[in-house]
């Protein structure tokens, strides 16, 4: 299972915005039935619940089982973390997402999202400009992150989203 040290290292990687793959080694040494892999992945996902974006791969370094897939996955994750998405394409995804689920309201005030742009890579970092950042609920931010992930993949990399009120002069 996931050790305390695994959890600490994973937490440091997550906080630092590093792309990650969760690799479970010594797969050859585990007694398996038809549900072993599924149960193990559920356990790993529960213990590292903040890393939902990280793929889980079961390998055996001793026998070489799935090691070739690991290198393909590393290439894929590195490319995803460095991906740049044009502002126009991002804003189409944003418009589609808002059409499916309207932005939240609070005491009659509706959140208006003006646009989104990417300001960094490794990890992908986006900034969303809106009328009132206080109206931007974390669940709607997570919804938009999931829409971006669903559209562009972004496997194995955290995604950063910063909310800015129009007229804010803060550093990005």
Segment roles from a protein language model:
Residues 2-172:
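C-terminal-of-GTPase-core extension/linker across diverse P-loop GTPases
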């Amino acid at each position: 299972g996931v050790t305390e040290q695994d959890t600490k290292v994973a937490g440091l990687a997550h906080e630092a915005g590093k792309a990650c793959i969760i690799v479970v080694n010594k797969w050859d040494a585990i007694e398996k039935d038809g549900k072993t892999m599924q149960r193990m992945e559920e356990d790993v996902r529960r213990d590292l619940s903040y890393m939902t974006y990280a793929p889980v791969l079961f390998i055996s370094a001793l026998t070489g089982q799935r090691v070739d897939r690991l290198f393909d996955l590393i290439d894929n994750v590195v490319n995803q973390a460095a991906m740049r998405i044009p502002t126009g394409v991002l804003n189409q995804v944003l418009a589609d997402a808002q059409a499916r689920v309207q932005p939240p309201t609070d005491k009659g005030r509706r959140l208006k999202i003006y646009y989104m742009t990417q300001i960094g890579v490794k990890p992908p970092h986006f900034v969303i400009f809106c009328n009132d950042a206080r109206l931007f609920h974390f669940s709607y931010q997570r919804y938009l992150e999931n829409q971006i992930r669903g559209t562009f993949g972004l496997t194995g990399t955290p995604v950063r989203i910063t909310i800015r009120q129009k007229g804010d002069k803060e550093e990005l």
